[in-house]
């Protein structure tokens, strides 16, 4: 039986975030339909009540911040010559840069970007769905990656795991 040199995550993490974001958008759109309003589901389309400049500023700040964090973290993988994709083998344990503060800065960046997009869409539902999205990422991506990294890098990963928090 062949062994695989990757964590075996359930799906590419960006697709998990995108799936939940699109579900939030879709539910908000359905909630705005007249038949949904009549049936009492209009709350799905409720907005934040923020004025456009405030909403745009908050959304832009979060989106840019999340993308910058993602770029910094992913750039370390490329500079160190290892794959950023979790379905490919890891050849180096990255513990510098944003990885000094979070073991998962890319997923943290995705979450911040997602929050910005939810605000840009003016959708409470999209923001509420960030919580189950993070649960799926935590249980079916991060925990699998952690088992893989512990097996691959042994004591070095265990020491890193004890020194740096999973998210923040």
Predicted segments with their positions:
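Solvent-exposed interhelical
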Residues: 99
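Membrane-anchoring alpha-helices and their flanking helix-loop junctions
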Residues: 1-96, 108-168
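Extended, alpha-helix-rich binding/interface surfaces that flank or overlap catalytic cores
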Residues: 104
